[in-house]
Regions:
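N-terminal functional module of multi-domain proteins
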Residues: 1-15, 26
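Polybasic "coupling" helices that flank or enter modular domains
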Residues: 42, 59-131
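Short hydrophobic/aromatic patches on the structural cores and recognition surfaces of FHA
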Residues: 38, 95, 137
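Cyclic-nucleotide recognition modules
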Residues: 16-81
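Phosphate-/nucleic-acid-contacting segments
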Residues: 105-202
């Protein structure tokens, strides 16, 4: 799911991507008019919660109110990172940062395995999210693959060198407010016995 705006000349700007379990339109809880549209990229299951029911729940359950407030603040933090990327990062860094962000957010909901995750967005989607043309995105993806930072096969992205990608992107997951995820990685020792090692993510 993504939030987007269509400008007067018909061009689209993707404002954010949303993962499983996210509120895609939380601002509508208190704002009568939204300045964005919500669209889907893949088939999704949408759960609708009446505003009044959610407001009552927030009024009677302080922890729920705190969670909603935290979600809104995290949303704002992500928007600031995106603004910084589009305004000051190179094309190379923009895509690197976005792929790191996807990894951290999908890890938090158990959708990353061996640094590999589904990436159902098109190059046009990536362009509209990062302020580039689709041609520039295509060229930058080739550069990331040539540097052996990522592998992209169909709709599946694998991060080949997390440490280098994080350094290039200047990525720090703190703004996402997600738990650090330990990813099991099979290792074969010199005796041929498989053991599990855990790579701590930033």
């Amino acid at each position: 799911v993504h939030r987007y705006m269509i400008l007067s000349e018909g061009r689209r700007q993707i404002l954010s991507f949303h993962m499983a379990g996210d509120f895609a339109d939380l601002p509508s809880l208190y704002l009568p008019v939204l300045d964005f549209t919500v669209g889907t990229i893949t088939p999704v299951t949408v759960v609708g919660i009446p505003h009044e029911a959610l407001r009552r729940l927030a009024d009677t359950c302080p922890n729920i109110a705190l969670w909603l407030w935290k979600d809104a603040l995290t949303d704002a933090a992500m928007a600031r990172k995106w603004i910084a990327s589009i305004g000051r990062r190179s094309a190379y860094q923009r895509l690197a940062h976005l792929f790191c962000e996807f990894h951290a957010r999908l890890s938090a909901v158990g959708l990353v395995q061996d640094d590999r995750y589904k990436l159902p967005v098109t190059q046009v989607d990536l362009a509209d999210a990062t302020g580039m043309t689709s041609v520039h995105v295509n060229r930058t993806l080739k550069e990331l693959r040539a540097a052996e930072l990522i592998a992209l096969r169909g709709q599946e992205l694998t991060i080949l060198d997390w440490g280098r990608l994080v350094k290039i992107a200047e990525f720090d997951s703190g703004y996402l407010q997600v738990q650090k995820v330990a990813t099991p990685k099979p290792q074969i020792d010199e005796t041929g016995v498989s053991a599990s090692a855990y790579a701590q993510r930033v």
